[in-house]
């Protein structure tokens, strides 16, 4: 391994690029030249960041469950804040996924965003930096700072570049997630008052000394903070509005990365911090997850807007993640992590596909489409593969995560597993219905007759995701083996 502080470089490279764009790119340049220059800097930054994360993945030792590439620097010692970062098997793929999806979003944004492109790309680079920081933070306060900083650029993206109701959606997104943040902050203050440290590797061994009643209150405050982010029912209503109003790239990052921060928080903070209380309250989370799967699937069936349907499907798919996590089985948690990764790729592909349709017809209403496959066979093929993965077809990424999550929960709660399995059937119904109504049949809208198939930049954005969907489905052990020991280590307390 290199002795370079590679995680710090990966976190701060996008931030340095932002500073360069804001401070040193000459504003007097003509708009077209300025946009090209900004796009080149953003593209170079995202490519280099992606290369760095791939290097980390290659050098990562899967036979070691402890944090690797660890860096630790004192920052504000009086309040326990250190720049303490590292990567284990649970975090590694989310770091890679963040850099990969950011690169794809920047490629697409260069060709589709017409106004304030400099500010738009700056927001994506900021989110990339903050997300990587959150996934690698080992200091709990540092995790909180990165976790909450992500709200600002996402709020701006929805509020400035979103649809007609973007202000309402952006405010709703911000208020819901900020509501969860307040609970998390209260939990942090209490933890520090008792343990006088935010170092995760230190406080995990001491939280059992906290009185049981206080542990239970602490558990609920942290749970709510992460449940809002996932989002779990009843904290879910901000997501459909945010997805419908967000631009395509905003929806990709929201579904592909931001939703995963909540479930990652369960794995990184809640379960290891409060293992006994987590087991006690697991049954409530399991049934909330089952309700989310069935309810969201039924609501998705009734949607007339493509993005709203995909948004509700995301809530259902994240339900499989939470039942897997709270099964407290190696199979279930491994399935949950795999499902998080798979959903990140599948949902990103779905939103990019919807984005290509919207660029041509400027509507997300399902009834306005029909017969698109006859004019866009490449898109239809990509859509079919993505759709089949979304419904959990064997040999696709979606099957592995859902199957392992259900198998894990089946070992501890047969009733919950059987009810949750119905969600797969419902998912197949609404996704096949969507594909049929959009892609098949006769062309009833004359504008569709003038559609052209995917442009090169659109193929460049979607094709890698399709390849990953197939690779994950055919070679799941290459992914599962990387975080196997980290999952085993997580379960030691259970």
From Swiss-Prot:
Signal peptide: none annotated. It is a multi-pass membrane protein. The chain crosses the membrane at residues 5-25, 36-58, 90-110, 119-139, 140-160, 173-193, 206-226, 252-272, 281-301, 318-338, 339-359, 376-396, 412-432, 459-479. It is found in: Cell membrane. Pfam families: Proton_antipo_M. It catalyses: a quinone + NADH + 5 H(+)(in) = a quinol + NAD(+) + 4 H(+)(out). Keywords: Cell membrane, Membrane, NAD, Quinone, Translocase, Transmembrane, Transmembrane helix. InterPro entries: NADH_Q_OxRdtase_chainM/4, NADH_UbQ_OxRdtase, ND/Mrp_TM. Belongs to the complex I subunit 4 family. NDH-1 shuttles electrons from NADH, via FMN and iron-sulfur (Fe-S) centers, to quinones in the respiratory chain. Couples the redox reaction to proton translocation (for every two electrons transferred, four hydrogen ions are translocated across the cytoplasmic membrane), and thus conserves the redox energy in a proton gradient. This is NADH-quinone oxidoreductase subunit M. The lineage of its organism: Bacteria, Pseudomonadati, Pseudomonadota, Alphaproteobacteria, Rickettsiales. The gene is nuoM.
